[in-house]
């Protein structure tokens, strides 16, 4: 396979995963939000909240279905384009694939039961809400299984490698490795954070379309109730993200040092390593364009001390060093996070000190777009994770080139994957818009 074929295959896979992660984050978060809305409605004896839960459950069902289709496309792509990964590690990662299947069955069965028993006289409201919790359970277990596979690719464990063969396989260790746990507990709050902001933003846009004098009236009481609850939930998830990000940084410094070195363009192993913000990294590791160096900050983040050693890229063979473009992606990610922090501060500042400012059009618009900025942050995070593993498909054992199919037709049939995702994305948008359009004014966000 020539370089053009390898590059095309990576582009196709990146495109597929970029679309897939959007379906995933909604498929994981909406079950939690729907259950939360329903339980609040039951506790407060508020039919409007229950109706909102029912409204979002319809959208949730669409996104779960499209997520399944998306996942199937990914599985086909893995088998057809990257057969080397399964050939090399199938014996190790077979368990999480099987686990994911059973978890999905739990999710699918209880989702069908959940949707079929809305307003059923044979199922109490509390029992119906309990059924919804099993949907949450199934989706969460499914997410862990798939995340553990990615974690294994980033830091393989659970086997011995003797004479080019995998032996002494411990599938449990591979599935519940430190890498899997770190990735899972960092990515899940990120999904909850982003989707809760998207939903809050839709209600914010709804309020914003009204006249200024009407925005804080009883007409939008339920909308403000949802917005405030979701913004508090998002803030809680953001605090959790700060904690897990710190853990992730320290984990990278110890277990994937070349990735951290590429992110911060650390050429030589050093203590008192600075954190570099901004700039563009050249191939030889120089930083051009305006940038800021925060003295010793990277060492502190990596090991809680300025004297903590940060391993540099020169410790690794040139061909095994990750692309330095991850530094640019990380800077963009930090910039978007700073914008999101500003939006959260503005919202809670207005909420605490001057509630009338909540009706401000600029603030409502900022809340409205915040979820999409958060989605961009997640996309960038996964890009850093995956590109930062290059040139490896399974770090240290199997290169991306070795994992690629030997067929020369990748540039011919490969275009089917982005085309399929484009069609799926359009169909999903149309289906969700139809649900919103058909919903009554009192049952959710209006178009």
Over which residues does each language-model region extend?
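Polytopic transmembrane helical bundles with strong interfacial aromatic enrichment
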Residues: 1-447
């Amino acid at each position: 396979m020539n370089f053009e074929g390898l590059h095309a295959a990576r582009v196709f896979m990146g495109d597929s995963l970029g679309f897939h992660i959007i379906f995933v984050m909604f498929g994981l978060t909406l079950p939690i939000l729907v259950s939360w809305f329903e339980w609040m409605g039951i506790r407060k004896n508020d039919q409007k909240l229950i109706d909102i839960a029912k409204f979002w459950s319809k959208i949730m069902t669409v996104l779960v279905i499209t997520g399944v289709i998306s996942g199937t496309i990914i599985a086909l792509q893995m088998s057809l384009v990257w057969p080397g990964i399964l050939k090399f590690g199938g014996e190790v990662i077979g368990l999480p694939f099987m686990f994911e299947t059973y978890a999905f069955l739990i999710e699918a069965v209880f989702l069908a039961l959940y949707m079929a028993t809305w307003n059923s006289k044979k199922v109490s409201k509390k029992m119906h809400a309990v059924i919804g919790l099993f949907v949450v359970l199934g989706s969460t277990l499914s997410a862990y299984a798939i995340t553990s596979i990615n974690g294994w690719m980033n830091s393989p464990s659970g086997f011995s490698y003797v004479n080019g063969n995998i032996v002494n396989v411990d599938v449990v260790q591979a599935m519940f490795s430190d890498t899997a746990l770190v990735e899972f507990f960092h990515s899940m709050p990120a999904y909850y954070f982003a989707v809760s902001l998207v939903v809050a933003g839709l209600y914010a846009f709804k309020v914003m379309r009204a006249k200024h004098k009407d925005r804080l009236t009883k007409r939008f009481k339920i909308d403000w109730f949802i917005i405030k609850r979701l913004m508090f939930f998002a803030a809680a998830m953001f605090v959790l993200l700060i904690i897990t990000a710190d853990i992730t940084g320290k984990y990278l410094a110890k277990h994937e040092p070349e990735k951290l070195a590429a992110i911060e363009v650390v050429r030589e192993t050093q203590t008192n390593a600075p954190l570099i913000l901004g700039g563009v990294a050249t191939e030889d590791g120089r930083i051009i364009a305006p940038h800021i160096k925060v003295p010793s900050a990277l060492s502190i983040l990596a090991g809680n001390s300025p004297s903590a050693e940060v391993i540099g890229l020169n410790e690794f063979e040139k061909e095994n060093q990750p692309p330095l473009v991850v530094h640019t992606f990380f800077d963009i990610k930090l910039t978007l996070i700073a914008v999101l922090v500003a939006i959260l501060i503005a919202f809670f500042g207005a909420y605490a000190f001057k509630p009338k400012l909540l009706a401000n059009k600029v603030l409502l618009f900022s809340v409205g777009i915040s979820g999409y900025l958060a989605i961009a942050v997640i996309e960038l995070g996964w890009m850093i994770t995956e590109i930062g593993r290059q040139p490896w498909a399974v770090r240290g054992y199997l290169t991306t080139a070795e994992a690629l199919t030997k067929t020369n037709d990748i540039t011919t049939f490969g275009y089917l994957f982005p085309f399929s995702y484009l069609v799926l994305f359009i169909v999903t948008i149309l289906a969700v818009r139809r649900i919103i359009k058909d919903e009554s004014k009192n049952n959710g966000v209006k178009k």
